[in-house]
Amino acid sequence: MPERGAELYQCEGTQNLWSDRGRIRDHAMIGCLKLRAMHLNLRRRSMVAKHLESNNIPGPRKFMAGPWTCSRWQGAIFLLICGLSGVIPSARAWAKEHVDLVVAHGTLVTMDPTRRVFEDGAVAIQGDTIVAVDSSAKIDSMYEAGKVIDARGALVLPGLINAHTHMSMSLFRGLADDLSLDDWLHKYIFPAESRYVTRDFVTWSTQLTLLEMLRGGTTTVADMYYFEEEVAAATKAAGMRGVLGETLIGFPSPDSKTPADGLAYTESFLKHWKGDPLITPAVAPHAIYTCSEELLKDAAALARSNQAPLLIHVAEAPFEIEKSRQEHGLTTVQYLARIGLLGPNVLGAHCIWLDQADVQTLAHFGVGCSYNPSSNMKTAAGVMPAAELLAAGVAVGIGTDGAASNNNQDMFEEMNLAAKQQKFARMDPKALSAVQVVEMATITGARALHLERQIGSLEVGKKADLIVVETSAPHATPMYNVYSAIVYALKSSDVRTTVVGGKPLMEDRRMLTLDEPAILANAAKYAAQIKASFGAKSN
């Protein structure tokens, strides 16, 4: 009889094979053992090897050192031998592999390189990583899950990527509207920030934004603001993924009296969060019109020395281009290229006022861009040449910008407006298709943030960031094309479940990591204070 443990790998009808009754059956048994070994951990493999050695069964030693593979004809021969010899693998031999989570029975929109869509698809997740993407039937036959999320009647998408916002500005939502960007910034926002922005303000405002984004299907956010230590702590506690940039600016800010203080704070921030699984710390010089050339160069050097992303507003409004031409004789993009700031670690927000040379320069340096249609429309800043940038090979993501200039964090609304704005601006209904827009909110947005190897699509080996979006509402019925439905019909309120790194953060619309009543209560408290002292209009 085999030693203890060998019965785990035995096959029905082979009880007498251990006495080496025939070469054919021996090799059939070896085949069973080989196939089973593909799914065993190292401890079990060693048990199989020990059994084979003790019974003098020849030939299978090599497969114990690593995964065993066979060609189709070898597999066919093995199955034929099994049939001739009466050797049939038992149910125990083909036991399912355990995984932590399976999301099943939804219409799976993978956004992988071939843009596969499974009508009844499933994703298997172990830890924070996707281990399988296939039909629900196939996943069910292979895996046993600790938890199953039933996605019937819904789409399963990669989590949405908000490529540009200012999370801590949500408490300024509606404070100053219907203004030009220049007036909005200099007459209202900068004064309000100097007066109200504190660590506590940033913490609660960030949590308010995280609450809105998770409810709307955003799983990764690129943020620029002050007190990013607090932003990072709140984001990590909520379980969201973030590329978070500490803002550098050329005048006293809420967390730094001088640019030198800001650089020191930023360097400490980079070192503190480096290597975190959810938080990617970044350097964020505000813009060329608020930062000196010296500060811009120092910011670029700091980002490079720490291998960190750099986030910056680029060519957002006409006044910026005029200022750049007057002071430097160059466009914003050409000026940034001249001083050595551009590179593959850079994300430029807005990128509206570009000429053809600017587009080619951004492509040459591998710069990512964020398209923020709502904010740009509201401040009449202009329309990004998104189609031209994409055609040149520039990775363009979609962002909301801060709630103070938008006034929400709704990525479904941004997708809808992105497609329609491009069509209207060019008088071309084919400009920026629904598929392209979904790409911009997922895999191309990941490219813009230089995170495409980790997120942006539902593929084996990538982080398990996904959302479940209901399609049963009247506004989503019927659904002939999933991409058209996502861009033109679905709403953020249709998001049912949000998963980041394999962890459900919202399930069946119930928040699991954020205290919604406390967040809303604190938001109301701050709003009352700001309205009383700042004189925000009530009508």
Q: What are the roles of these predicted feature ranges?
A:
Residues 171-204, 241-263, 318-345, 365-368, ...:
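Active-site gating loops and adjacent loop-to-helix segments of metal-dependent hydrolytic enzymes
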Residues 338-345, 387-473, 488-491, 503:
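His/Asp/Glu-enriched, well-ordered alpha-helical/loop segment
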Residues 51, 73-81, 87, 91-121, ...:
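Active-site microenvironment of metallo-dependent hydrolases
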Residues 173-240, 262-275, 524-529:
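Alpha-helical scaffold segments that flank or form the walls of functional sites
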Residues 94-97, 230-352, 357:
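Metal-coordinating catalytic core of metallo-dependent amide/deamination hydrolases
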Residues 42-44, 53-77:
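Bacterial N-terminal signal peptides that target proteins for export
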